[in-house]
């Protein structure tokens, strides 16, 4: 039995998942309808949480000259130093203790989950609900990752979805690989990002005390959890050299987590296939999913941003979904939203690339 089918049988026995079903419609019956007349909220896409993370095809860039790039030299210098330190950390790998490797792997996975299961699937898209202990864990893990606080990350990500591949998209991939990967962090935001970002409903984030607490104490939290703790633990507990602890366990580990996330914005918007919606840039990219613990099924995710698995196949190359399901098994996660097979097939028939089909 295929792994994803076995997983579905197992998970259905111990948890409740909200399935987003496809109501009867002419679209599902014959795949008809012209794409340019497709409404903003498709019949198969309707769900109750929020709609500020759903692509708005009606938004277009304003005509006229583009604003001049304004470089943020502080970010350029810090990113340059970080990656120089990470490169030096690579040369130290042969001298590191085995416990340090295990520590780095542990810190990498926890940090990644703070992004994927935390700020992305929980807070940005509200694809599932989490009880307080899980939310506390994810807010700590997110701080360990140091990729902006939950409020700012979620705001930018909702803008990225709603205004994808336009000037209002913070990391618009139409501006090139480097810009969508890291360049967007090295320059001032395009005025359209600020203008359209201000129109998004962020009341759910402002109302959550844990999110605002993290935002208030983010800088000292990052200093402790992203830099001090991962350096001191191997140095103090098992006698790793301070040099290895700093450059390998901290700088290299942090740089790898950053680039794994950035590849979702760059590579997964340029390389891969589009079985769900060929009219948008995001693609299915297995290599990205491996590094980003399940975030590489990007054509599916941009088509169905409210699916907690961010993929049609749940556990397939998707450790984040496995983690969320484990949390559901012990009662810490609930109300996981999963798009029905009928809705997926209907969307593939109508907008997907013809050379691919649902597995």
UniProtKB/Swiss-Prot annotation:
Source organism per UniProt: Ovis aries (Sheep)
Example GO biological process: monounsaturated fatty acid biosynthetic process
Annotated motif Histidine box-2, positions: 157-161
PANTHER family: ACYL-COA DESATURASE (PTHR11351), STEAROYL-COA DESATURASE (PTHR11351:SF102)
Mode of membrane association: Multi-pass membrane protein
Localization: Endoplasmic reticulum membrane
Motif residue range(s): Histidine box-3: 298-302
Cofactor-binding details, from the entry: Expected to bind 2 Fe(2+) ions per subunit.
MF annotations from Gene Ontology: iron ion binding; oxidoreductase activity; palmitoyl-CoA 9-desaturase activity; stearoyl-CoA 9-desaturase activity
Residue numbers on the Lumenal membrane side: 94-97, 238-241
Domain notes: The histidine box domains are involved in binding the catalytic metal ions.
Top-level taxonomy: Eukaryota, Metazoa, Chordata, Craniata, Vertebrata
Broad EC category: oxidoreductase
This protein's name: Acyl-CoA desaturase
Motif (Histidine box-1): 120-125
Ranges per topology, Cytoplasmic: 1-72, 119-217, 264-359
The protein's Enzyme Commission number: 1.14.19.1
Keyword Signal: no
UniProt KW keywords: Endoplasmic reticulum, Fatty acid biosynthesis, Fatty acid metabolism, Iron, Lipid biosynthesis, Lipid metabolism, Membrane, Metal-binding, Oxidoreductase, Phosphoprotein, Transmembrane, Transmembrane helix
Binding site for Fe cation 1: 120, 125, 157, 161, 301
